Amino acid sequence: MAREKFERNKPHVNIGTIGHVDHGKTTLTAAITNVLAKKGQAQAQDYGDIDGAPEERERGITINTAHVEYETAERHYAHVDCPGHADYVKNMITGAAQMDGAILVCAATDGPMAQTKEHILLAKQVGVPALVVALNKCDMVDDEEIIELVEMEIRELLDSYDFPGDDIPIVQVSGLKALEGDSTWESKIEELMTAVDASIPEPEREIDKPFLMAVEDVFSITGRGTVATGRIERGKVKVGEEVEIVGIRDTRLTTVTGVEMFRKLLDEGMAGDNVGLLLRGVQKEDIERGMVLVKKGSITPHTKFEGEVYVLKKEEGGRHTPFFAGYRPQFYIRTTDVTGQITAFTADDGANVEMVMPGDRIKMTGELICPVAIEQGMRFAIREGGRTIGAGVVSKIIE
């Protein structure tokens, strides 16, 4: 049987469910697919299908993630749900599932709990742009005042992490009742999806952002000059445009005199293209792997940053022993290893710790020996002699 073609007739958005353990994320995910399946916009999945998600390996880290897809009248969604708390954290830090927005699930019976807060913070740090709240298990709370109090508490919590608490929609739902086919609660799931359609913005396409290409290889063509190759991460670049070479050494300006892809000449290269860019007046030794070519003035190199890091366990190929402040690994950023130092760290909840064990999650301050184009929300790996021992995301640029 021939595979059916993916129809691109609606905008595609990646979302996920986040929130405290046992607040009903997986049940709600199942309910969404069941309610939309009745309109022919999804394949109905039950709790077991989603909860029994197979393990995935992303950069050598084992993550349990369930992927479901469904449509609303407006959009096509890919939705991730992770059964375990540790899986969420790994997922968000490694970028295994990039989210354009998330449904924060909070049980009306409990109100916000520890992981509710932690997931909101993580969403902020890894750059999830928008949230919608599903206040779940509302069928179990008779008192309207309790629900109002929980809503206020959630809004204050969102505000404290710089999300617009007053504007984020909070929809009262019961994933379980909707799954059982109760029509009142089914309509609440539809209301939730209408809020998701309206409040989670369509992602800005990479092509509309300022040009950036990480240099993977450099060679010189006799009589023509120096060519840098790589995959364009975002934006587009035209022949004749000025670009900056950023990172490792002082930033310098050059002009793109040719764009080639698969040995063919192009007028412009765009996000996703693997290209060779011919650069005017640049010697082969002036540019190396690990530098980036960017739209003039769009990015500055940095050496000091804060990051959220997951340190691999021994079984995941990580270290067998702990490390201490002052540890000097390589940071693999975009296309190259840069030596640096982890000057300070705390546990992920801010508690002071003396050492970092394999399997830990930490907040760290890193300092690189030379400036590189690092940006907030960017992923990096921590390596030692060529093997990955940690995965992280830049939460803040210091200098």
From Swiss-Prot:
Region (G4) location: 136-139
UniProt: GTP binding residues: 19-26, 81-85, 136-139
Region (G2): 60-64
Binding, Mg(2+): T26
Subcellular location: Cytoplasm
Molecular function (Gene Ontology), one example: translation elongation factor activity
Region feature (G3): 81-84
Stretches for region G5: 174-176
Key words, A-Z: Cytoplasm, Elongation factor, GTP-binding, Hydrolase, Magnesium, Metal-binding, Nucleotide-binding, Protein biosynthesis
Domain called tr-type G: residue spans: 10-204
InterPro entries associated with the record: EF-Tu_GTP-bd (IPR041709), EF-Tu_GTPase (IPR050055), EFTu-like_2 (IPR004161), EFTU_2 (IPR033720), G_TR_CS (IPR031157), P-loop_NTPase (IPR027417), Small_GTP-bd (IPR005225), T_Tr_GTP-bd_dom (IPR000795)
Enzyme Commission identifier(s): 3.6.5.3
UniProt superkingdom: Bacteria
Leader sequence residues: none
Family statement: Belongs to the TRAFAC class translation factor GTPase superfamily. Classic translation factor GTPase family. EF-Tu/EF-1A subfamily.
Name recorded for this polypeptide: Elongation factor Tu
Gene symbol of the encoding locus: tuf
